[in-house]
Amino acid sequence: MNALTTKEETWKLIGQLMKEGYSTPFELAVFSVGGKMGVMLQGRAGYDYTPNSLIKESLSWQLANKPDLMAKIRPLRGATTRGFDIEKYPMLVTVFQELGISLDDVYLPDMNPDVIEAGSVEQNMQATLMMQNTSVEEWKEALTEFLLQDAIYFDEEALEYVNSSEYSSLTYRQAAENFAERYLNYEKSYEFAKAYVSADQKQLMTGYAEELRQTFRERIRNNVWMSDASKQNATEKINAMKFNIGAPDEWFEEGLADLSQEQTVLDDVLALRSARMNLKCRLAGMANQRASFHVIIIEEGSLTTVNAFYIGNYNAMFIYPAFMLPPTYNPEVNDAHNYANMMAWGHEITHGFDTDGARWNKIGDLEDIWASDADRQEFKKRSQQLIDYYSTFDVMPFETGLKNDGAYTVAENVADLGGFFLAYDSYVKHLKKQGFTGDQLRLQKQRFYEAYGYFWSGKWTAENAKNKTLGNEAKGVAKDEHSLFRERVNGVVTNTDDWYDLFDVKPTDKFYVAPEKRIRIW
């Protein structure tokens, strides 16, 4: 570094340092655009920015009924994925060439659109130009500072020195744990999958998922409120949806660090960071669905967590191993239990068509599935019916007054209702193939409903119910975008016709809903 004399040499060194796992002012962001993986540099020092951060997945459903805001958001997202001007940004050209990434896969915001938020296009542009104009001596000083930050991973004496200066106090163990939480996800997931996700198990679970896909196709075909053109769009989307189940279909060696020869934690740090960077470079330009599971693991967390979710800009569902193992899936129990638990999978599939998911097309770009405004308005009307219905539920166990927030939870409630129908219809088809008829068929249907209730069984205090519903900033409890467990059961089954027949529910019963008021969306 001391031998640097030109900016070009400095930029080239930055790329080399990134490849070797050292700290620099930059991180490499990978994101989905136009059905493939694009990349861009995001700054570490206050310039964090990725195209998808402008609309958080967990909040974007709230834009569904705000067309004016959506009209502004669309050009913003378009701006974030425009290829950059090579002549204007020679620093980026040099860094990406050193990383071995094709410039065809590189993006940078190059305009100031109408909507500016934190981590904005304008801020990122200014930061990039500022760094590009930084002198060699200033770069040396900055790079030295970044490299010295890694001293905390070398030994306890180095950590003590760093803590005594400008950094927050950490123990050596805490520093290592923080690092592991961020950089060990791919290796940890690889080892976990080898132990718990067999090829046979993955094939079996994929078979269940394909049953749900086929059921969704049938429900689209039988839908009574959508036009044929919108049905075609929805069918194309469910056909194209990627099911990431258990573990990636393939693992990339670039992302797996060999730690067997490393002597210090710092050696591990550099090796793992280097592997992470090499994997991101490998993913650049790849089809977004093929890359999706790898990106999620390195960016969001390892397969050891209990998680299942859908991400619109991949048009992909992700099912982690916990949902394939006991007690969630258990081959030793009645099929009703396992199919009822598949509701969680159906829930994630339906997220691709909820108040947020319906805005994404089959390749994961922002283009909703509605072929006509009449379909769009009917979907909004039915979603509003669900909002109104869920808003009638009292969430406190032994008192009235606090109602469920149907608007805040609408996307999850749409997914719950759709997920139930996908799992239940699939189970009934399975039973009929097995030869169940009459009273035995009825009994198995009842068991499905009971298993669904068991899936959502839980126990908590009235205070927790209140905090989850309203949020409690003082206690660090965020408002939950999901309805509480009891409401997730009652809100769904009361909108299904079979519940009334199977459990002899009468018009005089508390949760009776007249047939014409039962809500159907998907």
Predicted regions located by residue number:
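Zinc-dependent metallohydrolase catalytic domains
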Residues: 2-25, 29, 206-343, 351-522
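Noncatalytic, helix-rich "gating/capping" subdomain that lines the substrate-entry/channel surface
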Residues: 1-212, 261, 266, 278
